[in-house]
Curated annotation (Swiss-Prot):
It comes from Bacillus velezensis (strain DSM 23117 / BGSC 10A6 / LMG 26770 / FZB42). It is found in: Cytoplasm. This is Ribosomal protein L11 methyltransferase. Gene3D superfamilies: Vaccinia Virus protein VP39. InterPro entries: Ribosomal_L11_MeTrfase_PrmA, Ribosomal_PrmA_MeTrfase, SAM-dependent_MTases_sf. Belongs to the methyltransferase superfamily. PrmA family. It comes from the Bacteria. Signal peptide: none annotated. It is an enzyme of class 2 (transferase).
């Protein structure tokens, strides 16, 4: 089978929404080429430093690549992708160059080439994310391993917004907590909360592709007894009192349910938000405070921030 590689030159801010657009269009895998990765020291499973090739990365911005099967619907699909990406401008998302190129690759190239980008990555004091095809031996007895398959929707979970959220969950979630994950995507945050011994985790996403992906990942990581994934629009119709609510989605979306999150939390409960580009930090912070929250910590990585707020 022949595959079409769609390459989009964009900004850090636009990486996550564009990746989601590509997955919803049927992309079988997404590769993110970020020059900031060249500055990170990485280790392989044997503790050896491995090097990334600078020729694989742009001088500025980020390149997002996706793969679609070549068929009679490809042209229509690509046009739809372009239109949906351009619509992100309505949400004040900087698209940068926003150049889109298309090339053809064969089955073997597509099936193996993207694996060079993915290795086990330790993202917090406790958590390491491991691609499903890698054999990994924990370095510490209390290390928590999350297995992810980037061939499934929503990538491997090493994007800064996800990393910040997991670091925040590690600090906040206590044994026996009741947790809500809004806009779960891959389900990785729900998996992390379950591994931190939450009593229950309810994960919600409006996108049926995300719901299916999250359910598969929850099962893969053997936390189905704790984490439940359902299709739902943000917090609509949700009741009860909870200890932690986590949301890794666009700042503009977070602003729509800050008050609702406040009402669903117990006194002393925490609202962890991420997916916030630096320039939107103050706007989200003010909205949280207006809803009644106290900001207790702001974490940052590259151009992104995560805000931990307390009721």
């Amino acid at each position: 089978m022949k595959w079409s590689e769609i390459s989009i030159h964009t900004t850090h801010e636009a990486v996550e929404p564009i990746s989601n657009i590509l997955h919803e269009a049927g992309a079988s895998g997404v590769v993110i080429e970020d020059p900031l990765d060249l500055m990170k020291e990485r280790e392989n499973v044997y503790g050896e430093i491995y090097q990334l090739d600078p020729n694989d990365y742009p001088d500025e911005g980020v390149i997002v690549k996706a793969y679609l099967p070549i068929n009679s619907f490809l042209g229509e699909t690509v046009d739809g992708i372009k239109e949906t990406i351009n619509n992100l401008l309505l949400y004040d998302i900087d698209l940068g160059r926003n150049t889109i190129t298309i090339s053809e690759v064969n089955e073997e190239e597509w099936a193996t080439a993207w694996k060079k980008y993915y290795h086990p990555v330790k993202i917090s004091e406790k958590f390491t994310i491991v691609p499903t095809w890698e054999t990994y031996t924990p370095v510490h007895t209390d290390e928590l391993i999350i297995e992810m398959d980037p061939g499934m929707a929503f990538g491997t979970g090493t994007h800064p917004t996800t990393v910040l959220c997991i670091q925040a969950l590690e600090r906040i979630v206590q044994k026996g907590d009741r947790v809500i994950d809004v806009g779960t995507g891959s389900g990785i945050l729900s998996i992390a909360a379950a591994m931190l011994e939450a009593e229950s985790v309810h994960a919600y996403d409006l996108d049926p592709v995300a719901v299916e992906s999250a359910r598969l990942n929850v099962k893969l990581n053997k936390v189905s007894d704790t984490a439940e994934v359902k299709q739902n629009n943000l917090l609509d119709g949700i009741t009860g009192e909870h200890d932690v609510i986590v949301a890794n989605i666009l700042a503009e979306v977070i602003l729509r349910f800050t008050s609702q999150a406040y009402d669903l939390l117990k006194d002393g409960g925490h609202f962890i938000t991420s997916g916030i580009i630096g320039q939107k930090k103050q706007e989200v912070k003010e909205a949280l405070e207006k809803a009644g929250f106290t900001i207790i910590e702001i974490l940052s990585m590259e151009d992104w921030v995560s805000i931990i707020a307390k009721k």
